[in-house]
Amino acid sequence: MAPKKLCLAQDKDADALLSRDPLALLIGMVLDQQIPLEWAFMGPLNLTKRLGRDLDAADIASRDPEELAKAFATPPALHRFPGSMAGRVQELTKVIVDQYDGDPAAIWKTASTGAELLRRIEALPGFGKQKAKIFVALLGKQLKVQPKGWQEAAGEFGDDGSRKSIADITDGASLGEVREYKKAMKAKAKQAAPAAKKAAPAAKKAAAKSGR
């Protein structure tokens, strides 16, 4: 991984770990849902402390699930849903062991195109289509992992100068800008919901009529 200093957890030690450890970054990405992103990306550092060792895919994959869940749930919990996230992270590490010889960085280092990189990431436990695109954008923008077509694979999150996702967070100010964008998108979606609900019966009626 490139020696770029990430600024996601907004904590010096946690961000240093994310910057140098590919597995820590992947785990942070998995945790980044339904909780503040700083909390999510603090998770890998707190997990290393609770496990008493550096993060290792083979080690986590082979641990007793209940033991791992306990490490996630110990206050302060690593996530709002520590049990399910512990299971998801363990599934992630098993894929890394089985498909990438235990080397998480191989997921992107051996991808020859952006499309291939996106497919690989989307196939990982804990990554949907949008999160996979965001991670491709993060790799390309901040870690200089730029296989051919990476921006196209990242979609809108790969746009230069955007402030749409964690791929664009480089300091406290950009974090605020990303938060404002997400807030605006959430408000827009909320406004659109009643209109869509109102239009649904009419569309259903029209479809039924045309099917006669």
What does each model-identified segment do?
Residues M1-D15, R20, G114-L118, K129-R212:
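C-terminal accessory module of base-excision DNA glycosylases/AP lyases that mediates lesion recognition
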Residues D13-A24, I35-L37, H79-S84:
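Structural motif
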Residues L26-V30:
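Short, aromatic/basic-rich helix-turn unit that serves as a nucleic-acid recognition element
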Residues F41-L47:
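Short Gly/aromatic-enriched secondary-structure transition segments
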Residues L51-E122:
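Alpha-helical ds-nucleic-acid-binding substructure associated with the helix-hairpin-helix region
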